[in-house]
Amino acid sequence: DPFGELYVIAVPESTGAAATVTLTVTGAATETGTVNVYVGRTRVQAPVTNGDNVTMIASSIQDAINAVPTLPFTASSSAGVVTLTARHKGLCGNEIPVSLNYYGFGGGEVLPAGVQIAVATGTAGTGAPVLTGAVAAMADEPFDYIGLPFNDTASVNTLVTEMNDTSGRWSYARQLYGHVYTAKTGTLSELVTAGDQFNQQHITLAGYEKD
């Protein structure tokens, strides 16, 4: 939409812990190749040279990830283990997917011979931002579409209150209207539970199953 206005409201970082993910490298490379790490939809390619050991491969992955400042993670490595740490604290870091060789052999993405890498969840992110300031900043400005990047109960309920039919944006007194959109990843049962919990007429929760 080249004509629609877009407003973005920054919110304070939540108190809590930042999510982490680990990539554990085993085996020395017996050929030259590339490690393809996907952080969300972004592919990061780390070069591997024949003869590289686990420490060298992990360092290459670390450097490749840190070379992309727009990624939601920063990387560190030690003794063949790469640790990705979310740039921001909070529950939202738990849903950032990290995978290897998404397109597989057919897409030309395979680990170099001799190398194995295991991806695992590390420390779970905790905490959610306080959105009362953001809601106050919206004041009585009408918005057709409101994007909510957080899907925790407290954040969604803050918007539920703002959008309600009695005193919120859909009330007779305010008549601002609009609709909120957010998303969640999880197992099928987790998404069903979330859908039941957030069954609100003015909020759409898009659910995506984890790979």
Task: Show where each model-derived region lies.
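Catalytic cores of large soluble enzymes that bind and process phosphate-bearing ligands
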Residues: 49, 53, 123-126, 151
